């Protein structure tokens, strides 16, 4: 027999932990650039009976029977994704962004092939060739980065590296780069050396979909993204590609790197894409950028250094060394968390510290924008952060942290989250 008791009764320990996390999310200012608050309808789809169904294969080409209704859901997700991004082909089955990237590599590369990707410490991602990651172990990566004087991608140097190394693929995309990426130029560079162009837009996908950032789709052979972050969907992955690569990509996802798809998550992706196609999503994405620019300006006015000097998207990287040379990002992150401000330590380009200590904090505005924060609130947030950082290591630290926490909870109480247990 199946125990149909509610979670609170069936497993009070798990229920308690979830309740505590809900309270944390409600009372904290969330500035981690990769986090957001999803739609209740997305959560409803994730918790649906579709979690019970195995559906290896693709719509109308399954290895199991009884897939006629999950087929409807996957077709909806595919068609909405294609429409949202103007893509020729979409695969909605990847379980995550890393799984999506794994499939792209597997579709057209062989182990040992050369790939040109962005250095992690300059704003790239683990799956773009970091030696600790599968990508760096399976493929021969050479890397490009940003200029030390201005924090911007040097496209001329990148082109020279591509011409010298002759990679089979060039990967473009970042997890901590705050400026517009010139996908058209990247396409020219890739075509010039006969390489595939693979754009990982996990961080900026929502901005791209809404027209708040140029799209890589016309220029890239493959485009991957997560479906959370700026898209506000479930945690999952998505790959877009040219029709010519569709068969290779689909085979690389299943059976190449995955088995059964998560149909409840695919349903949630369909809901997310449907919401992103509405006019309100464009306004939301534009507000993310407005808030990010306002928050960056508030930090600059307080004497902080921002890598690249500002932002064009949803995030930016504060280099703490200019104002607080002895303060590590690890200490800053931990102390801000005590004041109910959540962010993450991050290496900065040409970092001199260990990544476990780091010199930068990465700040993003998707989550606070979802809650309803606007430009005027960004000065308040910057003031809270500045107060805490200035007090670290002084006799005032505990008092300032407590006062800031009270100020933050007062602010967040004005913007309640739409969730109930």
Curated annotation (Swiss-Prot):
It catalyses: (6R)-5,10-methylene-5,6,7,8-tetrahydrofolate + glycine + H2O = (6S)-5,6,7,8-tetrahydrofolate + L-serine. Pathway: One-carbon metabolism; tetrahydrofolate interconversion; Amino-acid biosynthesis; glycine biosynthesis; glycine from L-serine: step 1/1. Gene3D superfamilies: Aspartate Aminotransferase, domain 1, Type I PLP-dependent aspartate aminotransferase-like (Major domain). It comes from the Bacteria. The keyword Amino-acid biosynthesis applies. Pfam families: SHMT (PF00464). InterPro entries: PyrdxlP-dep_Trfase (IPR015424), PyrdxlP-dep_Trfase_major (IPR015421), PyrdxlP-dep_Trfase_small (IPR015422), Ser_HO-MeTrfase (IPR001085), Ser_HO-MeTrfase-like (IPR049943), Ser_HO-MeTrfase_PLP_BS (IPR019798), SHMT-like_dom (IPR039429). (6S)-5,6,7,8-tetrahydrofolate binds at residues 120, 124-126, 354-356. The modification N6-(pyridoxal phosphate)lysine is found at residue 229. One of its GO terms (cellular component) is cytosol. Its cofactor is pyridoxal 5'-phosphate. Catalyzes the reversible interconversion of serine and glycine with tetrahydrofolate (THF) serving as the one-carbon carrier. This reaction serves as the major source of one-carbon groups required for the biosynthesis of purines, thymidylate, methionine, and other important biomolecules. Also exhibits THF-independent aldolase activity toward beta-hydroxyamino acids, producing glycine and aldehydes, via a retro-aldol mechanism. Belongs to the SHMT family. This is Serine hydroxymethyltransferase.
